C-alpha cells in the first residue's frame, strides 16, 4: 500500500471528484488511493480513499493535509472552500493543500444507508411532555438500530466495523507516503484534532508540522464530551443574547430585559414549539422546538449571529417560524442519513457505550442542569452507541505523542462546541504540545478573521516557528 503509484487527473472546483478538462482544473487534481479495510488483515478486502489537491500558488513546501472535522465531514469539499477566504494567501502559496475524505465518508468508500430518512427514524431528540425518559429512550434506540441495519445492508461488507479514527490515522500515513512526504504536515479542525493527535500517537517519527484547532480532550468519555458541549452551548447562547440586546447582531433584537430574561425567552420559544409546532408562510409546514434548538445551536458563532436574530425576530414577535424552517431544511439536506450514520459509526468506534438506562437518565438530568436550554440535545451519545454497536476499536485515553515534533494546539475561549479547557488539556497532555489562544466566540479560530491567529499559524506551518509561549490573540 505504501508503494502504490497515484494517478492524478484534473477535477476543477466541482465540489467533488468529477473529471474536468485540464484548462478548467483551476489548480485542482484528484486521485484515489487503495488501503486495507482491516489493517490486521492487509491481504484481505480493500477500500478507496479520495484525495483532492490544490496546487501551491508559489514554490511549494510540500503537502499540507487538512480535515474539517465532523466526524464525517468532507476534506474533498474543504480543500475548495479553504481557497475562498479560509486559508491565507501565504499558506495557499506555500503548500499543495490536500483534502481527503476519511474512510466511510463522501467520495471515499462510504457508508450507504439507502433510502433511510435523515433522522434515521430515531424520533424526537428529547422526551416529549408527559413522556417518561425510558419510554423515549427505547423509541430513540429502536430508531438508531433500524438505521444501523439499513446502513449495514447497503454498505460494503465489514465497513461499519472499520471506520474508526485509529484506522483513518493509519490511512493518513499511507497517504503521506504515496505523496512522497517524509513527514505529515497537517491542519485539523474540531474532530480533525482527534485524527491528528491519534496520528501523532501512532506515528510520532512521521509527524511534521501539525496544527490542531478546536481541540478534543482525549481523556474525556463520551458522557463528559456531551456535558461539556451542552455547557458550552449554554454559555455561547448567553453571549449571543448579551450582544443582541446591545444591538450588535443586526436587526432589532426581539429579546427584552436582562440577559437571563432573553435566554428564558429562547427557552420558552423552544418549549412552546415542542408542545405546539409553530406555523410558517407555507400552510403545510410547521417547525418543532427540537428543530429550532438545532438551528440555534448551529448559529452560536459570531459570524452567524445576524442570521440567528433574523430567525428569532419573526418567531417571537409574530409567531412565524419561516426562517427557522428554511434553515432546518438546509441542515437536513446537508446531513442526510448516511452523513449522520457516518458520524455515529466513527463516534461509536472511538468511544463505545459504557452505560445503561439509569446512567443515561442521570446524564439527561445533569445536562438539563448545566444547559437548561439545550441539555436534552447532548444526552444520548452513549445511548446511541449502545443501540448502534460496532465498538470494536476504541481510542486510547492516554495520548502523549512522545517523540513527535512540536504540535500547535489552538483554542478559542468562547468556542460553543469544543471547549477552551479541552485545548488547554490537550496541549498539556502532548509531550510537544504548545497552546495558542484566541479570545473569540466561534467554533475554531484559523480562518475566522484574526490576523494574529493567521499569522501565528502560518508562521508555524510555513517556517516551523512556534508562537511565543501562551500567546493570546484578541479581536
Where are these regions (language model features)?
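Short loop/turn hinge sites at secondary-structure boundaries
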Residues: 135, 276, 303, 311-322, ...
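Gly/Pro-rich cap/lid or specificity-loop segments adjacent to the active site
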Residues: 1-291, 345-475
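N-terminal, charged low-complexity regulatory/assembly segments
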Residues: 243, 294, 306-307
